[in-house]
Structure formats: C-alpha cells, structure tokens
C-alpha cells in the first residue's frame, strides 16, 4: 500500500532540515542520536528518513506506554503488538486473542493508534532502532520539566520522547536530536490536571 511510503516521503522535510541545521551548527550533517515519538509514525518517519542507512546515527523510537505496557492500557505497539493488517498494509498491530484490532490507550491523542508504520516495524525488527516505552506519568513529568527550565510547552506526543531521556545514556560529546512536534498549548488542561 503506498500510503505509509507517501507519508514518510512528505515528512522527510524534517530530516532534510535537520541535515542543514546540523551542518551549520555542528559541522556535520548527522547526529549521534535521533529520538522521536511514534504512534502511526509520521513524525518519526520524517525524522529518520535521511538517516536510515547511516549506521553512525542511533535511532530511538518512543512509544506511548500508557498506564504501563503490561497493563493492557497502552499504545506500545512494537512492545505488545504482532504482525497483522491495518488500513491495507501489513505491519505490527495491537490485537486481541482472535486477531481483531485492539483499542489502544494513551494520554496523547496523537499516539493513541493501534498500528505502526511499516518503516518503524522494519527498523525495530532489524534492530536498527531502539524502542522505548514511556508511560503517561513519565511523559507529563518530562513536559513539566521542559516548561520549568526552558519555557517550552511541548505537545503530549513529543513529551513521550522527552520522557525517554532519563532512560538513555549519552556521552558529553554526543549530538542528540529530539524532535518536538505539535503545540503543547492544546494539551494545557491535561498538564494542569496532573498537578
């Protein structure tokens, strides 16, 4: 099915811009780490598109762990899903015991999706990407820290990527790119309700 490939190609402007900015600010066109949230995967596909074949770049995809990946209330498709069909293409899908698509759960509407793009499934299957699950509380905590220290209100989707940072280890010289997509002002009620 062409839809996932079309989305990835159109969103590739993200990684094209990353290449330009990294060359300008770092003197090279690639980071050591790329970190992106992943639901259906448009933001993540665009973030990694130009770097899939560059083995110097470590790719980290962050799923919505909801109330915990073992709680039955998450959208952690790569952690808990299995191969299936959704929207006309084969990929990893959250399914019940009979193979029916299962309702996902995430505090973030943008990550509340029962499937994953085929590119992301391939990156996970081949080990090209590391997969991290971040639960609702971790995402909100990370978002509130960004607000406190930098004055940036991230969207709930990107807050999951931020929530992965304490779970990863970097060297001081590493160039780390984490994509913040969306606008957090639309999520302000969720953030205020978490206090």
Regions found by a protein language model. Name each.
Residues 1-6, 12-14, 25-28, 53-56, ...:
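Active-site/ligand-binding loops adjacent to catalytic centers
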Residues 8-13, 172, 180-195:
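Glycine/aspartate-rich loop-and-adjacent alpha/beta segment that forms the canonical ThDP
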Residues 13-25, 161, 167:
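Phosphate/ATP-binding catalytic cores across multiple sugar-kinase/actin-like superfamilies
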Residues 24-37, 46, 50-54:
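Glycine-rich cofactor phosphate-binding loops and adjacent beta1-alpha1 units
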Residues 30-43, 59-62, 175-180:
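A short, small-residue-rich loop immediately preceding and capping a beta-strand
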Residues 37-48, 69-71, 158-165, 185-188:
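Short glycine/serine/threonine-rich phosphate/pyrophosphate-binding segments
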Residues 147-179:
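C-terminal structured "cap/appendage" subdomains that terminate the fold
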